[in-house]
Amino acid sequence: IFSLVGLGDPQVRAATPVNWSKMLAYAGMMAGRSRSPEVVSGIIGHCFDLDDVGIEQWVLRRVEIPKDQQTRLGQANAALGEDTLVGSGIRDRSGKFILRIRNLDRQRFADFLPNGDDHDRLVKLVEFVTREQLAYDLELQMRPRDVKPMQLGADVRLGWNSFVTPEKARKLPAVRLQIRR
């Protein structure tokens, strides 16, 4: 039955710490070629028991153009109106999204940070579900009531789970992590 969602090989399932059994509920949606933001956020919410998961599409990013592909007179990539680009990079909105997980208590917030218990599982699941290896950021938002003032000796990681001005942070206590460029 795992073959329906592309997980027929037991070695593939064993190689990652994702609870693949929860994926069976999405077998029909996973059989298709593309994944809508609603499907991706729904799967992530279901697999991690999260209530507030969303995706922002069409996020602006800058893509560097390798030197050998940059436009040069008398070289390839210099046909006006076809493949000419000026500069060493381009602005792109088709290859990046933001995965937002909101309303997390302090512990769940910590679980999704790079050194947290669920970070690697989440990254593997997103890679599997999206299929196309798009660039994305992970934005984690802590519940405002869980934002604590910075205090030495406490569970404090400046820039991750503590804020110099917690009053301002309570308005939008979010951390954005660049997962894939």
Regions found by a protein language model. Give the residues of each.
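C-terminal structured domains
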Residues: 42, 46-181
